[in-house]
Amino acid sequence: MAWISLILSLLALSSGGAISQAVVTQESALTTSPGETVTLTCRSSTGAVTTSNYANWVQEKPDHLFTGLIGGTNNRAPGVPARFSGSLIGDKAALTITGAQTEDEAIYFCALWYSNH
């Protein structure tokens, strides 16, 4: 049985304020099997993640190729397979991979936008 390792990293983007004011947390690592559905989540220390945080998800493959998957919480980038979807679950941003494939093994970054305006 093949396993897919999904490693998660953090990124917070700020506008008009200090980036250190917000801490973004995710699961440190997840493993799943091909064909399974997996959901990665991203939480903010400043409160609930909302559509105003414009959650973005980026994938980094082992060869250091970066691909933007989701922008603005739930907008899939052109050319990204339909198995990737973004949403809000409770107070967190989420990336769901429905029917994970072996080629989905990667590091996934969550980026949130913060604004004092």
Curated annotation (Swiss-Prot):
Domain Ig-like: start-end pairs: 21-117
Matching PROSITE patterns: IG_LIKE
Residue positions, PTM Pyrrolidone carboxylic acid: 21
Signal sequence region: 1-20
GO BP of this protein: adaptive immune response; immune response
Keyword Signal in record: yes
Recorded superkingdom: Eukaryota
The entry's keywords: Adaptive immunity, Immunity, Immunoglobulin, Pyrrolidone carboxylic acid, Signal
Gene Ontology annotations for the cellular component aspect, listed alphabetically: immunoglobulin complex; plasma membrane
Official protein name in the record: Ig lambda-1 chain V region
Species: Mus musculus
